[in-house]
C-alpha cells in the first residue's frame, strides 16, 4: 500500500451519497445525518495492519485489517458485514458482504486527493477527500 494513503483526510465533495445510502437500505433519519456529516478519515499502518478510522459529529467507526483477509465489520449504519480489503493498481478495494448483498468501496489517489467510489448494484457514489 502506498504511504500516500496514510494521514488525515477531510471530505470536500460528495456526489450521489443519498442514493447510495438508499440502495444500502439506510433509513431516512440516518440518511439525513449522513448527508450532513463531513467526516474525517484517518488512515494508519502498523506492521501489516491497516486501520481506517472515520470520525464525524454523529458517529465514529474504525476498522483494522490485513490486506486480503476477511474481517467482521459493523458499519456506520449498523450493518454487520464480512469485509475484505485488497490492493490493486494502487487502489484500496473494500468489499462488504451481508445478507446476500454486496457493496464495494474503492479508494484511490488522484492529484493528491483521495477519491472514494462506493457502488451498490447500479448506484455509484463518489466522495472526494483532501489531506489535512
Curated annotation (Swiss-Prot):
Any one Gene Ontology cellular component term annotated for this protein: nucleus
Disulfide bridges in this chain: 118-125
PTM sites of type N-acetylserine: 2
PROSITE patterns on file: FABP (PS00214)
Residues reported in the UniProt entry to bind (9Z)-octadecenoate: 107, 127-129
Family: Belongs to the calycin superfamily. Fatty-acid binding protein (FABP) family.
Quaternary structure and interacting proteins, as annotated: Monomer.
Function: May play a role in lipid transport protein in Schwann cells. May bind cholesterol.
Official protein name in the record: Myelin P2 protein
Amino acid at each position: 500500500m502506498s504511504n500516500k494513503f496514510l494521514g488525515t483526510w477531510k471530505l470536500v465533495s460528495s456526489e450521489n451519497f443519498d442514493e447510495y445510502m438508499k440502495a444500502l437500505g439506510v433509513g431516512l433519519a440516518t440518511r439525513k445525518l449522513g448527508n450532513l456529516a463531513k467526516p474525517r478519515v484517518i488512515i494508519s499502518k502498523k506492521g501489516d495492519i491497516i486501520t481506517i478510522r472515520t470520525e464525524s459529529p454523529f458517529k465514529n467507526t474504525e476498522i483494522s485489517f490485513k490486506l486480503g483477509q476477511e474481517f467482521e465489520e459493523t458499519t456506520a449504519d449498523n450493518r454487520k458485514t464480512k469485509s475484505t480489503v485488497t490492493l490493486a493498481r494502487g487502489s484500496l478495494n473494500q468489499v462488504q458482504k451481508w445478507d446476500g448483498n454486496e457493496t464495494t468501496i474503492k479508494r484511490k489517489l488522484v492529484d493528491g486527493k483521495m477519491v472514494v467510489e462506493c457502488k451498490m448494484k447500479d448506484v455509484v457514489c463518489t466522495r472526494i477527500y483532501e489531506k489535512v
